[in-house]
Amino acid sequence: LTQEELRNLLRERAQKEKQIYIANVTGIDKDVLSRFKLGKIDLYPHLFTKLEAYLTNS
């Protein structure tokens, strides 16, 4: 997945689940997740892997 593809997956999932829940489950800071979702930042590889695993396996 690319950063943009993962961002789109997060946007879709955030319509069903609270973003704070996703942050807690993945261990990614809610502010980092928010900035990523808004396209202001790209995730570091280790955070990308955590979020990708969560969004593609659940």
Protein language model regions, located:
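Recognition helix of helix-turn-helix/homeodomain-like DNA-binding domains
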Residues: 28-43
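Extended, non-core accessory segments
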Residues: 1-2, 20, 41, 45-48
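Alpha-solenoid HEAT/Armadillo repeat architecture
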Residues: 11, 15, 38-41, 56
